[in-house]
């Protein structure tokens, strides 16, 4: 992940996608997210986190399996957390509801 994110001082909600290059379900989820990324970015910031390169962030959010998505509200609190592949409608529902 590039740059540093101050999770206690977010300007917008943020969706974190934790993945690994060797993970087949991660590739499936990435395809889903690629399809809806434009819609996601209208409402929240979107960051992909490779767990093999950013172990500190993986540990900070207690990510134990991938793919995992974590949606944080503007206060930096976890609003929604999902492990595994989910349909785009489920992702967008939460992206539209978070503040």
Identify the meaning behind each predicted range.
Residues 11-14, 18-22, 65:
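Short pre-active-site segment immediately N-terminal to redox-active cysteine/selenocysteine motifs
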Residues 15-16, 46, 69:
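Hydrophobic beta-strand anchors of alpha/beta hydrolase catalytic cores
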Residues 65, 70-99:
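Non-catalytic, surface beta->alpha helical segment in thiol-disulfide oxidoreductase systems
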